[in-house]
Amino acid sequence: MKSIFLSLSLLASATVGVLAAEELGIDVTVPVECDRKTRKGDKINVHYRGTLQSNGQQFDASYDRGTPFSFKLGGGQVIKGWDEGLVDMCIGEKRTLTVPPSYGYGQRSIGPIPAGSTLIFETELIGIDGVPKPESIVYKQAAEKAEEAASAVEEKVAEATDKAGGKIADATKKVEEKAEEASANVVEKVASVVSGAAEAVKTVVADTDDVQEHNEL
């Protein structure tokens, strides 16, 4: 019974591995911000470079020809991996597609591509027919870095402000303490002077009384 469960477990693991290997991989290598993304039915212009996952050998590249490839997205004019992997893409965006046989050429041998091959496509969306090209391409990474930099500056300013506020508070407290100390010293000195003056007056009065008593005698 244990061996049966073990066999079933291994079979399930192998099935999961096969299903994972058959999934279309979409890696956005250069993300871009835009309002109008590709959708099925668009005629798009794409630059690409295709290689075999097994050995990295290049089998085709529009970059080498200097002309992007044009086709109707979702119209079945290209392999399934492209029809599904290039949807919701911005002009200027780059993606790397990992295309398993079920999304590529299956078990057919096509030119330099052996049967059952997993293909790697480096793609770049050059344009969408009928959609004006943006005057400038806003790269997400640059925007995110700018936001991070601005956030970091704000944090530094807040930190510096807190430190400065603390130092000012400390300095104010020290000034107040010194002022209180100086005031106390002044009061003490004034009291001492007043006390001395009072003693002097007492002495003068006492001397005057002595003189009067002597004259009366």
UniProtKB/Swiss-Prot annotation:
Organism, scientific name: Neurospora crassa (strain ATCC 24698 / 74-OR23-1A / CBS 708.71 / DSM 1257 / FGSC 987)
PROSITE patterns: ER_TARGET, FKBP_PPIASE
Transmembrane spans: none
Record's subcellular location: Endoplasmic reticulum lumen
Entry protein name: FK506-binding protein 2
Annotated family: Belongs to the FKBP-type PPIase family.
Reaction(s) this enzyme catalyzes, per UniProt: [protein]-peptidylproline (omega=180) = [protein]-peptidylproline (omega=0)
GO CC annotation terms, alphabetical: endoplasmic reticulum; endoplasmic reticulum lumen
GO biological process: chaperone-mediated protein folding
Enzyme class: isomerase
Signal peptide: 1-20
Function noted in UniProt: PPIases accelerate the folding of proteins. It catalyzes the cis-trans isomerization of proline imidic peptide bonds in oligopeptides.
